[in-house]
Each structure stands twice: as C-alpha cells, then as structure tokens.
Regions:
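Detector for C-terminal structural segments
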Residues: 168, 215, 314-344, 384-393, ...
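Gly/Pro-rich hinge or "lid" segments in bacterial periplasmic/extracellular proteins
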Residues: 135, 146, 152, 156-157, ...
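A structural "hinge/loop" feature
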Residues: 36-53, 75, 102, 124, ...
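Short, well-ordered beta-strand elements
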Residues: 28-39, 77, 87-90, 109-112, ...
Length: 532
C-alpha cells in the first residue's frame, strides 16, 4: 500500500473515532492525550500518573508544582518553619474557595489527611504522610485518637504540621496528589446516599478546573473554575483529556490535529521513534523515572535471590534502549537515577551471563532444567511493554534455557495483580514524586504500599528510617547507597532496566506553559495559547 494512502486511512480512522464518541461536545480549548483511562480521581486511591494529572487540575494542595516542576505556594500563600525544622505553620489564602463557593480552611486539610490515613480506606500512598508526627501509628492502628497526630488548625486559615524529623522535601510532598484536599461534606453525603462523589454531578474541588463531563473511554471535560483564587491567570477555558493506551491511535489523533498535546512517553510509537525525534514538535528531556522488573519474592522460584540475580544478570539493557525505546534512554544500574538532588548511586550489577548460569544451577536449575512455568506480566495496551517483554523472553531463553510465558492485562487489572502479588515477574515503572532519593527508596520498605514484591529486609528498613533523620546530605546519601546495594546487587527483588526520558509532542510556537523538568510535571493550569 502506498505510504500516502496508508496515512490517509489513519487520518480518516482517527477522525471517525473521535466523531463517533464526541456526541454534542464542541472541541475544547486544549485537547490532551493522557494515556490510560484514569482509575480514579480520589487522592486517597490514586497510584497512576494519568490519574494524578487529572486530580491536580481539579484540586490544589498547600503547595503546587509549576511548569518547571518546582513547588510553589498553592492554597498556602506562605509558611514558617521552626528552628529545629520540625514544625511548619502554613498560612492559607483567605480567597481560596471550593467550587461550591465555600472557603477552604485548615480543617479541610486535616479532615482530608485523616481520611487518607484511616486504615479502612487502605490508601496505598498513605505512607507519604508518615513524616507527620503520629501519622504512621494512626494508619497502622496503634493510635486510635487522631487528635494526637501532629496536625492542628490554629484558626480557619492557619495550619500547623508537626513532623517527626526535619524533612527537606516536605514542601514538595504537600504538592503531591495524595495530600490534595477533598470536600469531606460531599463525600459523606454521597456515601450516605450510595452515590459516587467523583462523578461530575457530585464533585466539589478547589482546583483551577471543575469536572464537567466524564465519559469512560471517551474523554474527561474540564472547564475553568469560577471560584479558583488565581482564575485570572488560567489560560484555558476548557480542556478535553482523552484516554488512549495504544501509541499508534494516540499519535494519529495528535498528528491529524484532533489533539494538541501528547505528554506520555508510552504513547509514542516506538517503531517510528528514529523518525519522530527529529521533528520540531518532539520535546525530550531526562526526568526522575525508572523502568524496571519486579519479582514476586513470595512465590517460587523467585523467593530465591539466586534466581532473581540470575535473571537480572542476563538482561542486555543497552540492546533494549538501542533497539526498542530509541529516545536517548540510559541503561539503569540503580533504582535512583544518578544526580537526583546530588545523589550518586552505587555501581549496581553488570551483565554477566556466566555468573547467572552458575547462580541458577546453585538454585537447583542447571541449564534451566526443572524450572517451572512462569509468567511475565505487562500492560496489554502498550506496544512498548510488549516489545520489551518479547526481547526479555528471548534473552532468558538464550542465556538461561528458560522460556517464560507472556501475560497481558488491561491497566486496572494489571494494577490489581501487582497489589495482590498475583504475578511471577512483571513490568514496572516509577516516577519520582519529588526530587530526592527517598521517593524511590522508601517504596521497598517492608509492607510499603508500593513495595508490591513481598520482599522484606530489616537492614534495609532500618537504613531508610535512619536516612530520614540524618541532616548532613553526604552522610544521608551514604546510608542510601548502602541500602540501594542491598536492593539491587545483593537481594534483587527488582531489576532496573533504564532511566526514563520524558517526551512531549506539541507545537511550541503555539502552545506555552509546557516545560521539561525532572519530575515530568506539566500542570494544565500553566498552559496557554501563544497563537491559535
């Protein structure tokens, strides 16, 4: 088929797809391709980046990330920090409003954080609040009286937060999705009536946009909030957020003008990467992200660290970035990307197939003999994940004599499988929540909400705990280096593959407010049209 005809078919298919699901909605000011359909916009539930992008447009924390990924004043217009670095006093804006016109108060934040920490809510990211005095004990059921947690509303507009230890990244945490405030009266009313409080007809937020429509697997329509304190500086009157897990479909929408912005690396068709990265609307920059493999340490044969190490030692990471990803990614030997807040990780593992085969034989599987059937789990809507899975399958077969089976799952099912440890080994990713090694390292403490490997190591746990209290940066980094050696080189519950490169497609001569940054944060409130 001629190339021009093929492209025309793609254009018509994309247009038909959009027209078939748009119904009565006119085109929004900005159309944004967001990746997978969000699982939720409840801050206590959110674990994925697509969900967080939507929530951050609908709600605003004490601080908020700007276009450069820097935490700036949000609902809190300023704050004070005690001399010992343990007590923050936040001064809230008197003109901060919920979308129903009510004032946002210090008590709203306390009630929202209490909800996230309530054990019955089972918030996976509740640990992001553990820096607050008493928060962990309350979340884990040892403390029953929430008034003993280090949160105090001095008055409607003054919130005091007492930390266990000085936490240099706490202001970044205050901008993170888990710490966003929710409108508790609405949640209570909806739960009593058996309603879903996140539906457009029920939702009350305090962010720069409000939720007008949510059509599953079609679009989320946001409109500029009339009650947001900084509404005069919001550039877009309306935004459509489109879900698309298929890179070719997403790119067709973008390239035919049906979408204005594509800011999820997983939506870039990898077979076209070498051609696409030379386009003027292709924007790439390093950011704090890692693509890695998780091993289920509770399930044989990966309960044996020798098996985990054997698998890790035969992976040709350079081949993966050269053959598949092709956007300038760097093979990873650590979980924490080098240079994160000045941190340099330990050396990690180098590829060593001979040692891998020795370890596998010592574990009772010489030449792969007797190795059970195992499944590599990955997202079924991602061509990139599939291509990496096929390449890994070949490496394990050639070097270890083991043929793994490939298992694809839809995004929500995949997340559930990880959380319930219903997998053997799986594709995983992590994007830093803030610019500090801790955002990567504290994932793998025993029973951590994002551990999802079943791995536990008391020495590692203690190191992460001690690092949280260490005030001298180099001493703190040395503690992290020792812990990361345990994680990657000694016990290997995970195997890092490569460090992420953030990719966005947009016309920079027309669209402003999209900036490369280490957190890959691109707030919708910052975007505006230079020209249409």
């Amino acid at each position: 088929m001629p190339r021009s005809v093929f492209r025309l078919i793609l254009v018509l298919a994309a247009a038909a797809s959009l027209a078939g699901c748009s119904r009565a909605l006119d085109r929004a000011d900005l159309v944004f391709l967001n990746g997978a359909e969000p699982e939720s916009i409840d801050p206590a539930v959110i674990t994925g980046q697509p969900d967080g992008r939507v929530a951050n447009a609908l709600m605003e924390g004490l601080t908020a990330f700007d276009a450069t990924g820097t935490a700036q004043p949000g609902v809190a217009e300023r704050w004070d920090l005690s001399a010992d670095g343990r007590i923050y006093t936040f001064h809230l804006r008197r003109d901060a409003r919920w979308s129903n016109g009510e004032t946002v108060t210090a008590r709203d934040f306390i009630a929202s954080w209490q909800r996230t920490l309530t054990p019955e809510v089972a918030a996976e990211y509740a640990y992001q609040l553990y820096y607050v005095r008493g928060a962990r004990d309350f979340n884990e059921g040892r403390l029953k009286d929430f008034s003993a947690v280090g949160l105090r509303a001095i008055d409607d507009f003054t919130l005091e937060v007492a930390l266990d230890n000085p936490t240099p990244f706490f202001l970044d945490l205050c901008a993170f999705v888990t710490l966003l405030p929710v409108h508790i009266p609405t949640i209570e009313r909806c739960e009593k009536a058996g309603l879903n409080w996140t539906k457009p007809e029920n939702f009350i937020g305090n962010g720069p946009f409000t939720l007008k429509e949510w059509r599953i697997f079609d679009r989320i329509r946001l409109v500029k909030s009339e009650t947001y304190w900084n509404r005069a500086n919001i550039g877009m009157k309306s935004i459509d957020i489109l879900p698309s897990g298929r890179p070719m479909t997403a790119f067709n929408f973008y390239s035919t003008g049906l979408a204005d912005l594509m800011a999820d690396k997983g939506l870039v068709p990898t077979p076209l990467m070498n051609e696409l990265k030379h386009r003027p609307d292709f924007h790439a920059a390093p950011f704090l992200g890692n693509y890695f493999i998780r091993f289920n340490c509770k399930r044989k044969p990966f309960d044996d660290q020798r098996v985990r190490l054997a698998f890790s030692l035969v992976i040709d990471k350079q081949l993966i970035v050269d053959k598949i990803t092709r956007a300038g990614e760097i093979p990873a030997t650590s979980l924490v990307p080098p240079g994160t807040a000045g941190y340099e990780p330990p050396p990690g593992l180098s590829r060593d197939p001979d040692r891998a085969r020795q370890l596998l034989a010592a574990a009772g599987f010489p030449g792969g003999q007797g190795f059970p059937i195992v499944y590599y789990l990955f997202k079924g809507d991602s061509d990139l994940d599939r291509d990496i899975a096929v390449e890994l399958q070949g490496m394990f077969s050639r070097e270890l004599g083991i043929t793994i089976q490939l298992q694809q799952q839809e995004w929500k099912v995949y997340l559930a499988s990880l959380s319930s440890l219903d997998y053997d080994l799986c594709r995983s990713t992590w994007v830093g929540d803030y610019a500090d090694p801790n955002t990567f390292m504290d994932m793998f403490v025993t029973d951590g909400g994002n551990n999802r490997t079943g791995w536990s190591n008391a020495v590692y746990d203690h190191a992460i705990e001690i690092a949280a209290r260490e005030l001298v940066p180099e001493k703190r980094f040395e503690i992290f280096r020792g812990a990361e050696k345990i994680l990657i080189s000694d016990e290997a519950p995970i195997c890092p593959l490569y460090y992420y490169v953030g990719i966005q497609f947009y016309d920079a001569t027309r669209l402003g407010g999209v900036e490369p940054n280490l957190l890959d944060e691109h707030p919708l409130k910052s975007m505006y049209w230079k020209q249409r």
